[in-house]
């Protein structure tokens, strides 16, 4: 056991984490050259394209160190994006050490800081590594100083490498052996193994990635999941080198995969503890949480007969992504669809993209919303995640909205812009800290405002330099009202929004004028109105298309012309009574582009 090292790599998006992992695998001979593809551990196409890691992957590598001993290095790849922070904390809890990979030309970013604090809280040894030192813009001394200022760990003499060209990779491996402690644990104690990740395989069902903390797990053992109390039998055990290699047993300190007869991911929850039925552990390992959805959106098929296909597709995605929640919902405007819950906006985009790409679906997505707590006058408390389900204003005592604490790292010259943006979004400043050339701002922001377009705005006001990390803080009472959009006198439920009273009139006007541009002209006039309760706050008209009925009357009597015009008007009126308006997908997305000046 003293020759095992479990470690993961913490890095901001694009700081070279996956490339470094590829180099480790190549250096330790995990795959031969023929099987090396770039970003071996990022197995989904969408992960490679966006250059982000979503699911945790793993590789067990044998490394012959300079002291002549062979070490087993277990690399657990972690996602770097803020939406997947729970997956990160699970990956880190399975390790004794973490490599903090920082781009030597860009310096420290907010998500790196957040994940690094998570690691330090979990008692994981953090080893700084400077990557991309072969870039002309690299400035290792400055970045070492930044790591010390911002994160507060000793970074002088941090290992320098370039994962792309392979310089210094061996030094990094030596550093892992030297700095990261060997796992502790008792092979003879009752079994305790934490599920780091789980995914669905079409042939064997659910594959779980586990880290054995205490005890030993063997083939054909009967095991129990401690949070759901489900029991099942071990069918296969093994490790990934990234290819899967079968083993007879996994002992304390090892990381490997476990396949049982479980067919649903809901039973193998990430962070849960696995133990033996025959000799169970009394306590589960700490840190398990049920994943909560933060952002909700409606997904509707463009063709209503694709509804069942969409259900199948969502169920298949859920097999691989336990944090995706969905339930059927009916909208008058869009027909049958699903209300889905996501971890954050990136998660929503990825699910939408996977549905379109892997399952060939055509979707309409409504604007994302968050969960509100509504206290009724009767004293009852309900949760509302869909604006059209908000009860009547008369029966509501207060509405509480979710507040998040956001940590923003930004270079000094953009601080003003970022603070202005946060104030526009009703943010409350909590803290501001100068660290070298960067400033760390902490704000309490309403999640509702962040969901819309905060991330894009933040990037554009800071020219892409600001980085953001956030976590949920609490629910707070707020002056919120429901804004309805009416087309031709009918409410379109899918366009309802819950907004703050201050920005309601402005938002209503903007939305109405946006809709006027997007709804195609019909044969009759269409009124687009924004309403709060029964009060109309904005109106726009989409002008009718009309044929020139006077074209055939060269000269002639005015009464003849009047007669034709009156006849046309009467026809248009009749049309308006029976006509219905098709609202295009772009109109639903318009909600997202409305700014809050």
Swiss-Prot record:
Residues 2-184 form the tr-type G domain. Required for accurate and efficient protein synthesis under certain stress conditions. May act as a fidelity factor of the translation reaction, by catalyzing a one-codon backward translocation of tRNAs on improperly translocated ribosomes. Back-translocation proceeds from a post-translocation (POST) complex to a pre-translocation (PRE) complex, thus giving elongation factor G a second chance to translocate the tRNAs correctly. Binds to ribosomes in a GTP-dependent manner. It comes from the Bacteria. It is a peripheral membrane protein. It is an enzyme of class 3 (hydrolase). Its main location: membrane. This is Elongation factor 4. SUPFAM superfamilies: EF-G C-terminal domain-like, P-loop containing nucleoside triphosphate hydrolases, Translation proteins. SMART domains: EFG_C. One of its GO terms (biological process) is positive regulation of translation. GTP binds at residues 14-19, 131-134. It catalyses: GTP + H2O = GDP + phosphate + H(+). It holds the Pfam family EFG_C. It is found in: Cell inner membrane. GO terms for cellular component: plasma membrane. The lineage of its organism: Bacteria, Pseudomonadati, Pseudomonadota, Betaproteobacteria, Neisseriales. It comes from Neisseria meningitidis serogroup C / serotype 2a (strain ATCC 700532 / DSM 15464 / FAM18). One of its GO terms (molecular function) is translation elongation factor activity. Belongs to the TRAFAC class translation factor GTPase superfamily. Classic translation factor GTPase family. LepA subfamily. Keywords: Cell inner membrane, Cell membrane, GTP-binding, Hydrolase, Membrane, Nucleotide-binding, Protein biosynthesis. InterPro entries: EF-4 (IPR006297), EFG_III/V (IPR035647), EFG_V-like (IPR000640), EFTu-like_2 (IPR004161), G_TR_CS (IPR031157), LepA_C_sf (IPR038363), LepA_CTD (IPR013842), LepA_IV (IPR035654). Its EC number is 3.6.5.n1.
